[in-house]
């Protein structure tokens, strides 16, 4: 395999579309322009897309279909389109600047705001891990009849299992998990054929926004939170740094374009899976000939009861197959969640932990509320906790989204690759709508809570003052991020060079090695 060494650099360039450098664990993208280069960029988008088909998504999809049939499909469409735009911006930030979102936040904000953003990001990682914990517990319950609360405790051991499997190579493990996850997707596609949802109703639900019935707004926010996750923005901006791309204007543009295409393909698959789950749940649970037993399951549908939806496809094996895929979904999401947690801690605090320790700490924080709810409320309570976790993610999204939008619109950070006026307008409209929906739901729900409360007047007043103070603080924090001007500093001096001129920059070996827990990490200068 022919290779050449770039002048004045240790970087190897090859005509092969995909090379992994064993010394740095980075994937090298050749200088020569070719459509085959696209294969060098495959990976980050699909890793990120795992979060869109995790147990939290399955839970919210199942409940929205069972309760509102196809009425909330438009949320999936809007969220998927928004996710594609937002995730592409996260990838662009990493590609253009050579730093991921958390590192930019550390460089941009003073100590107190930076620390608060780190805390919020860590809460988002833990909230994302809660559905994985509960989903895994449900899977163990279906496979081995283990009580849910014991299954929650056993999820703490998944860290050791994952570390053992990762010795065979992280990519092989991810391929196996992706295969199992898409097995359940195939089952839902086939079940979609058997359940025969009305195409007109499905299309109407996809393209006509509607929020009818009690709880529709809350479930819509849960769907939004399950689709557009804050930790994914940190994750995507860091994963792209594992590629050593030509640092020319044309090389960067090519990388951004290919990452957009890859993200589009990955999110299209995730979109089809989510639409299929909602459509199957809506068609089966709203059928006129539904048995009393299945109707009871639909009224309180969660991951632990959903296997009956696959009965037409795999018969008596439906619960086992669903459990295996649910287990795979939870564990694959655990891997990406671990990466996101590492990048968040490294970026905000310049602190790195061993992957097994990082995973264990996050999992312990997620186990505590999951265990309490599972003991008190059983599987039904655990299912509701998934919805709450998704809502938390939605409320935390602005604290990752606003910095991302401001950084990618900054000429000093992105140079000629900064967002255009159209892209900036579209992304700020998307962000504004998300924040507006969250604030409306938060205020209206809190007012309803106060009006229908049976507490005495003093307690209601105290709770009202406390609650509205919290809402005011939330709004003030978002306003600070939106209105604050970016620092006038640039780390992208190479962007002013000609299209053909290439500058070699320090490879992000620290980022590449963070994805390979079994190898020694390189701790180097981030600049």
UniProtKB/Swiss-Prot annotation:
Keywords annotated in UniProt: Ion transport, Iron, Iron transport, Membrane, Transmembrane, Transmembrane helix, Transport
Major subcellular location class: membrane
Any one cellular-component term (Gene Ontology): endomembrane system
InterPro entries for the chain: NRAMP_fam
Domain of life: Eukaryota
Compartments reported by the entry: Endomembrane system
Disruption phenotype: No visible phenotype under normal growth condition, but in presence of Cd, increased tolerance to Cd toxicity.
UniProt tissue specificity: Expressed in the vascular bundles of shoots, cotyledons, young leaves, sepals and petals, at the top of the flower stem and in the style. Expressed in the peduncle of developing siliques as well as in the septum and the funiculi.
Molecular-function GO terms, alphabetical: cadmium ion transmembrane transporter activity
Membrane topology, record value: Multi-pass membrane protein
One GO process term, biological-process aspect: cadmium ion transmembrane transport
Pfam family, one: Nramp
Membrane-traversing stretches: 38-58, 71-91, 115-135, 143-163, 173-193, 221-241, 264-284, 321-341, 364-384, 385-405, 427-447, 458-478
Family classification: Belongs to the NRAMP (TC 2.A.55) family.
Protein function: Probable intracellular cadmium (Cd) transporter that participates in the distribution or availability of Cd within the cell.
Protein name per Swiss-Prot or TrEMBL: Metal transporter Nramp6
